Amino acid sequence: MKCIKHPRIKLLLLFFLFSSLKMLAQNGTVTGIVKDAAGNALSDASVVVQAGKLGTRTNADGKFSLSLPAGVYTLIASFTGKSLAQKQITLAAGEAVSMDFSLADAGDLEGILVIGSRTPRRVSTETAVPVDVLNISELAIVAPQNNLNQLLNYVAPSFTSNTQTVADGTDHIDPAQLRGLGPDQVLVLLNGKRRHSSSLVNVNGTPGRGSVGTDLNAIPAFAIERIEVLRDGAAAQYGSDAIAGVINVVMKKSTNKLSASLYGGGNASTGANDHRGGMDGKQVQLDLNYGLGVGKGGFINFTGSLTSREDTRRATDFNGNLFNVYNAIENRALTGGVNLSSLFSNVNNTPNTAQIISTIKQYAPGVSYLTAAQQTNIQNATTISTLQGILNANVTKDELAFRGLERRNFNMRIGQSKLQSGQIFVNAELPISINHRFYLFGGYGIRDGNSAGFYRRPNQNRTLTEIYPNGFLPEIGSKITDASASVGVRGKILNGWNYDLSNTYGQNQFKYTVENTSNATQGINSARSFNAGKLGFMQNTVNLDLSHEYDVLAGLNLAFGGEVRLENYKITEGDQNSYERYDINGAAATPSTPATQLPTDFFGLARPAGAQVFPGFRPANALNKNRTSGAGYVDVELNPTKAWLLNAAVRYENYSDFGNTFNYKFATRVKLMTGLNFRAAIATGFRAPSLQQKYFNSTSTQFTGGVPFEVGTFSNESKPANLLGIPKLKQEDSDSYSAGFTYRVPKTSLTFTVDGYFVKIKNRIVLTGSFARPGGTPAGDLLTLQQLFDQAGATSATFFTNAINTESRGIDFIITNTFKYSDFSLKTDLAGTVSKTQKVGSIQASDILKNTGNLNNYFSEASRIYLESAVPRSKLALINTLTVKKLEFFLRHTYFGSVYDPNTADVNGNGLVEGATVNGQFIAVEHPIYGSRTITDFSVGYEISKAFRLTMGANNIFDIYPDRNLKTQTAANPLVGGGYGTPGTIDLSNNNQFEYSRNVSQFGFNGRFIFARLSVTL
């Protein structure tokens, strides 16, 4: 070790040492322990000086030490889920004082917030914008729900999320919305750090269509202490996506405690098992959480979660045609050892015509229920075309009886998907020194899902009856892997500056496997399962945040920082047989392959390419795209007086792919009287188009009115988009305004809050309606477009585009109260929201789209409904929690407002689907309305001992279902040029299969769910 030789440096060090000792001599010290009402030490509780900048946190043993100059102080102790406690102290120079705090359970969560304010010790009632604090660790014990999306759906009225059905990948990741805006217009944070989004784009007919959200269910609820929901625009503080607000998930920090939960339940409903009653949708979940104390105030907290969930089935029996005469004869031939369909690949181009005709005549008599006339006609036929007319007759009833089948054997799987998942998460903070801490948190999860598409019936050209004589139900298997890790260091530097330097990595992969299916163009050689490719999204974010509190006026907090983010999006192609169209020789077909060389069914209909239900991603779909962004912000909070708070924030952000944006926010809170606050905010915001929206492209099978269509989603930068005049994507911009009041009745726990808001969004990104493939023999650009459709195997196409402007407005209110007497306590929460979102102004489209009359394809009437009316405009939750000694009763009523179906029908029964002139065209605008419902949840918990607790109850205890779908009807639809056409069939139930709408639902349609949960704490 080298000695210090320079005398000036020695003098300087002695000066600093002397100054430090002098300062310590002038200070006093306050030490103590913070405990809960039961006497348990609270780790990481906050102890701060009221209206000051000094404070500390407790260590793993609940102990704290705070050095203060001589004076009179009010110290406030707080911990999430506990009431604040404050004590006054007079401290002399050099004095050491001991002061302990005991924190009772809070009626509302008043703990120190991570979001909404960059002042380190701001509580929810002090913020200038509305922030809800939800005690998820408590809800996860008493509530019937066991995943994060559903927990929030029933406790936070401004939040909406439901499981989807028959919607491809969206069956496996539930879209979530805040304040009726899109799933991608709410920012999700984990411990205050930006969470990565899902790799999945919602392209099917569900709320949130065209959006990319964050998979909240990738975070186990058992790992969560609380959730903070900022219900206000916050892009100036947090960056892209925070238009509707911010959801911050705060992980558990507990130490020296093992917690476990064993959960089981199922849907005991009259609608279970395709409306035959009993129970389905059985679930089992095991959760474990354990924390270790490390050093002085450090901790490592682990959570593991395993889930197994069966599917639910809510289909009704298909009432359409299943079998034709050809299916019956083919069946008799197979019984006789002859594969009739193997005699041809293309029925119009086969050397086996005579043998086919002969075989049909040979086995036709085995179909005993055919009439004599039918048998005679078959025996007299001399050509395939003649037989096609005869053998296409419907014989479903008789053939079902012959095969010993019922119509329910052909039911779809309509309901929640199957699920197997495993997750492990960690949250750690380790002291480096008195002023510096290292932290690490994140997790890894695997989720295997299985859902089903539309049943492929024997009489369809999509079905290889030589493989599946009775048709088949194709399945979509998903393997979702989600990984995240945040590492950083934070503390104090440079005379009181708080700093936080971190790196956050996250990735999400969605791998498709198509099962119990076939590629119809391969015939008998087709595989039964396919690797259909995968999607991948990666995000890496580096943040540096600095803040300092100053004794200016009644308090000033200055914060600034920067962010650098890298994003990557990948589409990986599937195996060739998952997407390819093969010719009759087994070679890959091309757009120039003659029709005579393409496989057909017996009736001459071309076999569709690729794996049924989800054709795999093609090499042309595969891509690997990156972008970077950088941002800087300044955030200032000033208290001119103790009763007045001002907040201002500005943020500049630059993206490598579309340029820069500048946003600001101003907010204020005024204490009007004891307990009564007024708050208001004005802000601009933005959302960058996601890489998924810019580059996603694929071909999928979508059903409209029970008819399958191969719909291609072309990227915004593709040639088809250019030929149709689809503009390049740019960011969404927003202006938001909010104002409200909070009131806490003095000397009580009764609290009222009400907030109104108004949000304008410009250049909102949507997924267009379908553009049909050009028919005939076009020339020029139309010919090019036709060829591009054919290369993608698509009959229609959709695109992502900035099409519209919207306005959203609403009112949120919350009332909370806790009444306690002896061993009795009653906590009551009433929360509600009323909101409205609507398109405003004209559709933003190119002249090409306007001149070709394509505006109503560009932004369709169905898209308008998904935007404005597919989620409830009103929602109300009344929650009562009654505790009597060792018993706890949980009762919740949740009101869901009405929603509109994006499909149109003759709702009023006048024989017409009412129309209106939109963009110069007369289109259908009459939509089914599904009325409001109130869902009741109830549970009873009993504390067997300090270590064991048993909770039993039900979600939707009265087994409530949404309104049923309209049945098949005959009505006239509007004609584009005006008037109404010839009456035709309208069937929203797809031949009676969908008892409830598959497109919208306020609360799902699984009915009553009963559960039991054993909680263990050691």
Where are these regions (language model features)?
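Short, acidic, small-residue-rich periplasmic hinge/interaction motif at the N-terminus
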Residues: K35-A37, A45-Q50, S78-K82, A92, ...
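Short, acidic Ser/Thr/Gly-rich low-complexity loop/linker segments typical of extracellular
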Residues: K53-K63
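Short acidic/polar hinge/loop motifs at secondary-structure boundaries
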Residues: S65, K193-R231
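N-terminal periplasmic accessory domains that precede
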Residues: V97-F101, L148-L151, A176, D215-N217, ...
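Extracytoplasmic beta-strand/coil segments of soluble accessory domains associated
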Residues: N149-S199
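C-terminal beta-signal and adjacent terminal beta-strands/loops
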Residues: S198, K760-K762, K836-K839, T894-V913, ...
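Outer-membrane beta-barrel transmembrane domain signature of Gram-negative proteins
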Residues: E466-Y468, F472-V487, K492-L494, Y505, ...
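Gram-negative outer-membrane beta-barrel transporters
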Residues: G756-I761, T768-A905
